[in-house]
Structures are given as structure tokens and as C-alpha cells.
Amino acid sequence: MPFITYNGALVGKISKVTANTARITLITDVNFTVGGRIQREESRAIGVVRGRAKEKEFLLMDEIPWDAELAKDDLVVTSGLTSNFPMGIPIGKVIEVKQGDYGLIQQAEVKPFMSLAPIEEVLVITDF
């Protein structure tokens, strides 16, 4: 189940639940992946958004087709192509676009909307 901040930005997913607790995986964790989509009128490019842990403060949007339109400041949202996340949850903003290995794909550095400061309140999406 995804969870979001009070203003709708994706924070992560619940990975384990017990009677009294829930374990979460933050979007910055290296084990976190979600389908992402560029939210712009001229482009609906699809890719995979991955966490990168403490080595980077930004996320990586990978596996974007080489011919997709992509630009700095594009909004990245969940694609809805995986059953665990509904479409349209804000993830972050593109800060840099690069060619992937051999020029077959593009990659984007994404600055998450989620603040890395302590989070006091989240919303859990249980039905979509």
C-alpha cells in the first residue's frame, strides 16, 4: 500500500504489517521501485523510478524510451501500471536528463517532493 504526505506527495509503501506496527520502505530506499510517468501535455513518457539510498538525494527514473520527450522541471507521477500504486501520485521533478548506456534509453534525475526532514503525518491509500 502506498503512503503519501498531507499534500499528496509519495513517501513510500508499506512493506510489512503486524497487529500494532507497519514497516515502510521510503522512495529513497534502494529496494524501492515504482512505475513513473511524465505529467506534461506534450509528453506522457513512461519509466521506472528507483530509490538510491543515502548515496544520492535524488531518485533515478530509468528505462525511458530514447525517443520520449523529456525536459528539466517535468513533473513525475506514478504511472498506475503496477497494481500496488494508483495513477497520478506526485513523485518529484526532473532536474537532469541523460542518455542511458548505448543511447537506447534515457534516464532522469528526479528530486522527490517528499522532504527528507522528519515526517509527522502520512496518509495510507488502502483502496483505489
PLM region spans:
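A secondary-structure micro-motif
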Residues: 1-128
